[in-house]
Amino acid sequence: MEKKMKEEEEEPLSPMARAFQEPSIDCGIVIKFGCKTKINPDVIVDSLKLNVFKHPRFCSLLDDDGTKWLRTDVVNVEEHVFVPDIDPKLTEEDVEWFVEDYISSITMIPLDRTKPLWEVHILNAKTSDAEAICVIRCHHALGDGVSILSLILASTRKTSEPEAFSTLPVPKCRESYNHRRGFSFFRLVLVVCSTVRLIWNTLVDSFLCMATIFFLKDTDTPLKGKPGAIKKFSHRIVSLDDIKLIKNAMEMTINDVLLGVTEAALTRYLHQSYDKTNEEAGTSLTPNRQDLLDRIRLRSLIVVNLRPTGSQSIADMMAKGSKCRWGNYISVILFPFTIALQSDPLVYLSNVKSMIDRKKNSLITYIIYTFSEFVIKAFGINVAVAFQRKIMLNTTMCISNLPGPTEEVSFHGHPIAYFAPSIYGLPQALTIHYLSYANKMIISVAVDPMIIDAHKLCDELEESLKNMKLAILEKGLPNHVN
């Protein structure tokens, strides 16, 4: 009995959690909520007092060497909730700048390790798309985006049905070859070919991953920065129905559409950046220079959730032996973008579709996760972090996509207008997070403001989506939304 109590009080950090809290990375998560009403801080504090002890990570401390969670029976919630004074004379535009600067400033201050590693910041000021802002900041060692989002959604209810929990989109199951009728020999050939392709793709991806660790670097562009810079956080809300329209017309997934939009936006942003540089220098974009732009190597780390399905219930994640797993159960894909202006915006979608289909037919995500755990156990956390940091330094950006509630939700009487998750601590100058919410898609960007114009990049992402929608409508492609 005594041993069991000690195990509950002391829990080892997972290998990925240990990596995230190392000083050379020290990665954190920020989630910005836009509320449709002013936020009552007392309601938030009372709710936290009732729920914080239900979730072990949020009432635990890191031990001195950062290898174990130590359960604490005392959490002073008031010390975790901050309500800064905001000048009531500020305009909506000024408030939006204030919110961006405020979030940037708090991410530069390390979380206090003498208490659980989370904070809540309440900004009761009106912006263009919300009456008030709530910012949750926590350490990535507590869990990945799926874990934290699942925890937050467990505390929300549907605005239309105050007693009902929020619902998430259910992934559609694809029909397996095993359930299709046909000549058995033909099915056998398909299985053999598919297996060979899977092995080949995995070997190629493994080689590219190792090459990136040791020598393969992305081209230096106006999107590639240096580690240690302060991050600026911005977001843009677009129509999820527009994305679904493109998805159905092009017969692809929402993830495919978002990658196509990203490739188009990055291309537009880079070409305009180089055009501006040439104008300032009094030169033109020569054919040789154009050829150089077309040969840019620009890769993103796409974060992949390794759980069986998308966001999980907290009960499932906390259950011992569960396959859902609370914590940092994620891996990455190395995804190359093609930087070339296209007269037809739908070409961007075709480009990413062929590449992501090949990446899906590979075991590289599981190999990277298993390899990271092996290196930590065999050679120590410093070697593993050095490898992870090298991959991030030699690539340009990071992308994540999370499914959110299918209907509007409220938190203890506060209807939520949007969720905007992001991350800080990575050495890359750019991260993009996509999150669906009701009939919206929220695009969140975190950038090094000395290198990248966050608002300009958001403009390009929004414009690229509009161009693709117009191209679909002009070509008369089937455009039903579901």
Curated annotation (Swiss-Prot):
> What EC number(s) is this enzyme filed under?
2.3.1.20, 2.3.1.75
Q: Which reaction is recorded as catalysed by this protein?
A: an acyl-CoA + a 1,2-diacyl-sn-glycerol = a triacyl-sn-glycerol + CoA; a long chain fatty alcohol + a fatty acyl-CoA = a wax ester + CoA
TM region(s), chain numbering:
196-216, 329-349, 367-387
- Lumenal compartment segments: 217-328, 388-482
Sites where a glycan is attached: N394
Database matches in SUPFAM superfamilies: CoA-dependent acyltransferases
Q: Which residues lie on this side of the membrane: Cytoplasmic?
A: 1-195, 350-366
Pathway assignment reads: Glycerolipid metabolism; triacylglycerol biosynthesis; Lipid metabolism
> Where is it made, tissue-wise?
Mostly expressed in stems and siliques.
Q: Which GO terms describe its cellular component?
A: endoplasmic reticulum membrane; plasma membrane
Please explain the role this protein plays, according to its UniProt record: Bifunctional wax ester synthase/diacylglycerol acyltransferase. Involved in cuticular wax biosynthesis.
Q: What is this protein called?
A: Wax ester synthase/diacylglycerol acyltransferase 9
Q: Which organism is it from?
A: Arabidopsis thaliana (Mouse-ear cress)
